[in-house]
Swiss-Prot record:
Catalytic reactions of this protein: N(6)-[(R)-dihydrolipoyl]-L-lysyl-[lipoyl-carrier protein] + a hydroperoxide = N(6)-[(R)-lipoyl]-L-lysyl-[lipoyl-carrier protein] + an alcohol + H2O
Name of the molecule in the record: Alkyl hydroperoxide reductase AhpD
UniProt keyword list: Antioxidant, Disulfide bond, Oxidoreductase, Peroxidase, Redox-active center
Lineage summary: Bacteria, Bacillati, Actinomycetota, Actinomycetes, Mycobacteriales
A biological process from GO: cell redox homeostasis
Role, per record: Antioxidant protein with alkyl hydroperoxidase activity. Required for the reduction of the AhpC active site cysteine residues and for the regeneration of the AhpC enzyme activity.
InterPro entries referenced in this protein's UniProt entry, alphabetically: AhpD, AhpD-like, AhpD_core, CMD-like
E.C. designation(s): 1.11.1.28
Cystine pairings recorded for this chain: C130-C133
Amino acid sequence: MSIENLKAALPEYAKDLKLNLGSISRTTVLDEEQLWGTLLASAAATRNAQVLAEIGAEAADNLSAQAYQAALGAVSIMGMNNVFYRGRGFLEGQYDDLRAGLRMNIIANPGVDKANFELWSFAVSSVNGCSHCVVAHEHTLREAGVGREAVLEALKAAAIVCGVAQALTAAQTLAAVG
């Protein structure tokens, strides 16, 4: 199970994604923990079993057990937060004065470098389409000294993984009915 398996599974019309996936997996902009945590969290956020299984297996070889769990923790907490903050945003400030009342302890104590956890949360928030969370995590990353290039590289990784998941879902669905 690996990035190579995903590339091989992509249909011809997704050749750009195949090339982008190969490139992002060799990036030098992010360190190994940042890269594989971003790929793992983004894969989980796509909800595509094949993408998660392939990336998850390779991420296990490239991340410590603690970082692996933290990346999955980022996707879990963002699954809740992205819905809450995106939904509250739709309400045009009418509920901004009320306390969320949601437990989010993992954000304060992720078990890994906080900037890496923020990077993974940023990537997942991008996949999930929560502009409030994307902006908040980007601001926190920049305040922590994470460079613009690293932030953009994480965004690219999330976008590529999301595109791969969509291409595979389309190909599998059409193959099943065709």
